[in-house]
Amino acid sequence: MKTTTKILFFILLAGAVAAATLFLVAADNNKPFLPGVTVTDEHPNGCVDCHKVSGGDDYRLNAELANVEGHPKIDAIVKNVPQDCLMCHKVGANAGPLSVVAHRDHYRNPNDNHFVSSYQGACLNCHSVNPGSGKMTVKNGPKNW
């Protein structure tokens, strides 16, 4: 009888471990996509981690902005992105505040928008949050050109 009890105990223990594992895997698959909070932050430098040369195409900001009519060349004046963009894109500036320009460009036409389709349109690709304090900041990184 003791052997039967031990076998039954180990079968129940194995079943409990399997059930707990399945529960944790299911819970993990349902967690929200929050880079730096619930998943690894693949873009700690914000803009420059996404706007880069990829698949033979140049998505770096200096290349993309060269196609914007009237936009000055940024190659020499910008060292850190997006911090240095605030030289021209501050609140009240004729160029428009960076917050409006960036959000408009990243969220317009969501059905045909690379940021939405490839990066889940997640705020935390560009922003970081301190979960303890709730303080939100804009990620910044050295230019990549």
Locations of regions flagged by a protein language model:
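Short sequence/structural segments immediately N-terminal
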Residues: T4-F9, V17-W145
